[in-house]
């Protein structure tokens, strides 16, 4: 299966709505989550064959207004495991990539910006929760997860010319 993505955007005088969904394998080449793992090793030559880690992610962003612009953002990413069983003769599989021990990630945020000619002032709060765990070598999925949360507040003053 190749990478599949869908992006939608709607704008008018008062509204901006944007959304994107991606389903793919080894999305690290596009700065995404994923990678690959060793699925077999030729015992005579040491040659390795690989299987990709599949990820799905989606997000939605909605902003309303002209001078005062409140907005919300939500996002979700899920590790779908590997296409094939991983090679793990000693119980430890070899994985290469980004977020290889991440099961899922949820992000939600709210923002408020004040916009006048050449200036934008804003405040944003974002909560992100990531579930990390250990690897199931038969499916490449993550099991025995625990959540880690992050709170972020960002203030901005931007001059546009």
Predicted regions mapped to residue ranges:
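Transmembrane beta-barrel strands of outer-membrane/channel proteins
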Residues: 19-25, 72-78, 108-110, 123-127, ...
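Oxyanion-binding "anion nests"
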Residues: 9-35, 40, 64
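Short, small-residue-biased leader/transition segments that mark boundaries at the very start
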Residues: 1-5
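Outer-membrane beta-barrel "beta-signal"
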Residues: 147-161
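Outer-membrane beta-barrel translocator domains and adjoining extracellular loop/strand segments
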Residues: 29-38, 43-45, 81-98, 102-103, ...
């Amino acid at each position: 299966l190749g990478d599949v993505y869908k992006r939608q955007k709607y704008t008018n005088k008062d509204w901006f709505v944007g959304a994107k969904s991606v389903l793919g394998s080894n999305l690290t080449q596009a700065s995404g989550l994923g990678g690959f793992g060793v699925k077999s090793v030729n015992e005579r030559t040491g040659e390795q064959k690989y299987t990709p880690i599949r990820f799905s992610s989606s997000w939605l962003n909605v902003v309303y207004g002209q001078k005062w612009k409140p907005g919300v953002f939500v996002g979700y990413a899920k590790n779908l495991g590997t296409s094939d069983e991983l090679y793990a003769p000693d119980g430890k599989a070899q994985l290469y990539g980004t977020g290889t021990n991440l099961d899922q990630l949820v992000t939600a945020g709210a923002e408020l910006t004040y916009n006048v000619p050449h200036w934008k002032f804003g405040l944003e709060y974002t909560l992100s929760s990531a579930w990390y765990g250990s690897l199931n070598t038969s499916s490449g999925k993550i099991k025995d997860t625990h959540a880690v949360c992050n709170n972020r507040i960002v203030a901005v003053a931007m001059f546009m010319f």
